[in-house]
A protein has these predicted regions:
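Non-heme Fe(II)/2-oxoglutarate
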Residues: 2-28, 72-79, 191, 218-220, ...
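Non-heme Fe(II)-dependent double-stranded beta-helix
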Residues: 2-44, 51-145, 151-152
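Conserved "cap/hinge" positions at secondary-structure junctions
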Residues: 52, 223, 245, 314-315
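Short, conserved beta-strand element in jelly-roll/cupin
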Residues: 153-170, 212, 220, 244-247
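Double-stranded beta-helix
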Residues: 170-228
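Short, flexible, surface-exposed loop segments at domain boundaries
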Residues: 251-277, 290-328
């Protein structure tokens, strides 16, 4: 049963430490060549888990590239493919660093991997220009329990994808999902400030599940599925990234460069489309500076800058969302 919009200022927040993922995620490899059955599972359970389907050479290249960045930061020894932590603290806030630029795109656009994504989406796929890279040491600060779709209004028919590039056993802090809870709407509490934390009492405790992830596995998470990263209690980095795929023929989220703006419009040079002018209003979801912070419509002209690289989601000539691009 769907929940109504949650507006409970006094509710106790759900903390990642409260999540006990006792369930086991199911492999969907046997459904990969049956589009209808695969989509039914996705809509019913809120995820698709595919084991070992990405080309192993492409996964190893992406792993080595991410670990090379981690080595620059002193988190691992250069050339160590296992990602064993050196003990140096992470500076944090590196999820969308330009140091990782291109790694996810090269992996997902590998022809063998594109064939997998086409089966997942049901048509040729391209990436939504939003990628977050994770090289998380043990005992890193935990994120929140959240639903991706709540923060991405207007993006239609896309599928979030999470990929681990090194073995990620339960003690390394892989992803946990609230299975089947995608059918109940959004749980985020609009009665509290951003990031609108989910109340502790709305997700059944028995719905949480996880698994041991291996390189080449692909986890597709429904935009409405509550999920979180679990604590890393190992001696290694969690090396993973999350992206999103959408229709290549009809993408709803496009990368664009800001050319000019007024208090109520923005003109951008959009990839594969060209120059377009969109209206902005108080309901536009504006995150052009920090992807985790919604900015005020009233201050639009004060924080916008020509040359900004954005993800643009539009409905006709109206901007539904402007977000800082992280093209991967």
């Amino acid at each position: 049963m769907s929940v109504d919009v949650i507006n409970r200022p006094e509710a106790e927040d759900l903390d990642v430490q409260d999540v006990v993922a006792a369930g086991e995620l199911e492999s969907c490899n046997h459904l990969l060549d049956d589009p209808e059955a695969l989509n039914r599972f996705y809509e019913e359970k809120g995820y698709i888990l595919l084991r070992g389907v990405f080309d192993q050479d492409s996964v190893a290249r992406a792993r080595d590239e991410m670990l090379a960045v981690a080595a620059q930061m002193g988190l691992v020894e250069p050339g160590d493919p296992t990602g064993k932590w050196t003990g140096k603290p992470s500076v944090g806030g590196m999820e969308e660093s330009d140091l990782y630029a291109g790694i996810a795109a090269r992996l997902i656009e590998d022809p063998a991997n594109q064939a997998v994504m086409e089966k997942v989406l049901g048509e040729p796929a391209c990436s939504v220009p939003i990628v977050q890279y994770r090289t998380y040491p043990p005992r890193s600060k935990l994120g929140t329990v959240h639903q991706d779709g709540f923060y991405s209004p207007g993006i239609q028919d896309y599928r979030p994808v999470w990929i681990s590039l090194t073995p990620c056993t339960r003690d390394m802090g892989g992803l946990a999902l609230a299975v089947g809870q995608n059918k109940r709407g959004y749980f985020h509490n609009v009665g509290k400030p951003n990031p609108f934390p989910i109340p502790r009492d709305v997700i059944p405790a028995e719905s949480w599940a996880t698994t041991d992830y291996m390189p080449g596995d692909v986890l597709v998470v429904h935009p409405c599925t509550p999920h979180c990263g679990l604590p890393n209690n190992s001696d290694r980095l969690r090396v993973s990234f999350d992206s999103r795929v959408q229709s290549a023929a009809n993408p709803s989220a496009i990368a664009a460069t800001v050319k000019s703006f007024t208090p109520t419009t923005v003109t951008v040079d959009a990839d594969r489309i060209g120059e377009i002018t969109l209206t902005i209003d108080k309901d536009s979801y504006l995150r052009p500076i920090n992807p985790g912070v919604r900015e005020s419509f009233d201050d639009f002209v004060n924080y916008m800058k020509a040359g900004m690289r954005l993800v643009v989601v539009r409905d006709g000539n109206r901007a539904v969302m402007l977000r800082k691009a992280a093209e991967g």
